[in-house]
Amino acid sequence: MATLDDLKKRIASVKSTQKITKAMKMVAAAKLRKAQESAEKGRPYSEKMNNIILNLSSGISDKENAPKLLSGTGEEKIHLCIVLTSDRGLCGGFNSNIIKKAKVYFKKIAEEEKTLKIITVGSKGHDQLKRVYKDNIVERISFKDSKTINYLDAEKVGKLIIENFEKKEFDVCTIFYNKFKNVITQIPQEQQIIPLKTPEVEENSSGDNYEFEPDEDEILSNLLPKNISTQIFKAMLENSASEQGSRMSAMDSATRNAGEMVDKLTIEYNRSRQAAITKELIEIISGAESL
């Protein structure tokens, strides 16, 4: 049975931890507001960019000579996967959920006997994936020193991907990230960015028609690289908001659990103290009676 001193030390230790988790929750809440706002503002832009490219692609006259970023290499033998995770922990199941999503895709690639290459963005994802997929990881990227998510970081990743694609290092590129829904819910996403998936358009469909100057091919050649960076930036913004939301939720839960533990330990301490006092009184009374 724990002594009174042991219980006092445990109560003090849990209270100290509770202060830390409460502070982390408040910091995450402050960061979440900004991250959520950035993610919500970025969604319309990335969606519009994607829609413009899809509209342009439907007007290409020579499909065989379409930009490779749109049409692909004609094969799907080598798959490059970009897995976005966090550089810091204490954010609940945020990292494990997206890793789980990515591993399902990796298993599918292995079953189809295709080649898998991985780029990890975030040290936590790298640490988990290297245990099983060490030989598949071709690049490790971290923005730990960046205070905020910015487009230049996404553009660096985008340029790296395009360079590898032009060197014929892969055929298909898919990005994995968490989409922010609310503080409690973050949804793991899987999005193919190379080649860009274009929906089948019916001949008699009455969609919006635009005239482009210069022609669609030239505009696409300029827009496609920007779109890749834009989609990566969107994923990074969503991931950042999801991370802060998950951390806030995890720290809130940890703070409440610490409070409950303090209450239980305090009750145990009071009972032990009461028992010790009662025992001491009995010994005093017994000693007095024996005199």
Language-model features: locations:
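C-terminal beta-strand-loop-alpha-helix "lid" module of Rossmann-like NAD(P)-dependent dehydrogenases
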Residues: M1-L291
